[in-house]
A protein has these predicted regions:
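Flexible, glycine/threonine- and acidic-rich loop/arm segments that mediate assembly and lattice contacts
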Residues: 1-325
């Protein structure tokens, strides 16, 4: 006899309760960016409850100020210091479906429980991969996909990012603080390349003014690691290693390989100005099991849904290099 929806739902709930952390680790254990910024929340992490867009305040200029003498003129003008970027909601899902034939073939308590948990775990892996695959893309604001790191660092000055066209945001010195910062020179990865790229994204001296996270491919990471091991000039971040990600710390930058990083790329990010906004009701939320509405097929289905986007509050705090070997 087929299980009732109450029974299927109970099995699903038990799966998430009984396995505890192992279940939620599925969302984060294949991508360093997902682990570091979404699970460990080592960056911006907002949980809006709604709105048409995700509002992210940003600072791009200085207010009025200076030295003065008694009787001198003091300005009270208000510079337009704070503006806001607006990122659109992006929606991802993973599907779990059980056909009636599956239930017949998996009769018995153990078999049906295993079937349901396997299907749900696969839905978790699916939604995770969909998100992780888009972290590094260059899709426009209006795309259904996440507004990725390439969009942050490589989109042109006439292309909107976070709802702002870079040439529309001008600092008092005439520069464009909302432009993407990148290098496309074809060259080999080296410590010199890392230092020079980090300098292009330097906001100011101090612990929060420079990139502190580096993301690259396993191939490039191994090259960097080999250079540093020879010179014995690096340490390792223990928390990241415990999470299962090989890493090294070089000149206050945590550098790690991410399987989803595109070939030939290195991204240097400042975690104080980048992270995630995830809807309060959309952090891998589960829908109840329901009838599968498909012609000539009987079954039940549920979804794991995610609503959010990658957000940036200071675009020039990050830089990327392509064409590396």
């Amino acid at each position: 006899m087929s299980l009732t929806y109450t029974e299927i739902q109970a099995i699903t709930e038990d799966y998430f309760k009984l396995d505890g952390r192992q279940v939620t680790d599925i969302y984060f254990n294949t991508s360093f960016f997902m682990k570091h910024f979404m699970d460990q929340k080592k960056g911006l992490f907002e949980r809006p409850s709604g709105g048409e867009r995700i509002r992210v305040p940003l600072e791009f200029d200085e207010g009025q100020g200076g030295f003065y003498a008694r009787g001198g003129t003091i300005s009270s003008d208000d510079n337009d210091v704070v503006n806001c970027a607006y990122f659109l909601w992006k929606n991802a899902y993973g599907n779990a479906t059980i056909y009636d034939e599956d239930e017949i073939k998996n009769a018995g308590d153990y078999a049906i429980v295993s079937l349901i948990t396997q299907k749900v775990a696969n839905a978790q892996k699916t939604v995770t991969k969909k998100i992780a695959n888009q972290i590094y893309n260059q899709d426009a604001d209006s795309s259904v996909n996440i507004t990725g790191l390439k969009a942050c660092c490589f989109a042109g000055t006439s292309t909107q990012y976070g709802g702002i066209t870079p040439t529309d945001l001008v600092a008092s010195d005439g520069s464009y603080p909302w432009r993407g910062i990148n290098t496309t020179t074809t060259e080999g990865i080296s410590l010199k390349v890392i230092r020079e790229l980090a300098s292009t994204a330097k906001l100011y001296d101090g612990p929060k003014g420079k990139p502190n996270v580096g993301l690259t491919t396993e191939t490039l990471f191994n090259t960097i690691s080999g250079i540093l091991q020879t010179q014995q000039r690096f340490t390792q971040d223990t928390d990241t290693a415990k999470a299962g990600f090989t890493n090294l710390v070089f000149e206050n930058k945590l550098i790690a390989a991410d399987d989803y990083c595109p070939s030939g790329y290195l991204f240097l990010l400042n975690s104080n100005f980048i992270g995630w906004a995830i809807h309060r009701d959309g952090y891998f939320a589960r829908t109840p099991w329901a009838d599968l509405v498909t012609a000539n097929v009987f079954g039940r289905t549920m979804k794991i849904k995610w609503h959010g986007n990658l957000i940036v509050s200071n675009r020039r705090a990050h830089a990327a290099h392509s064409n590396l070997s």
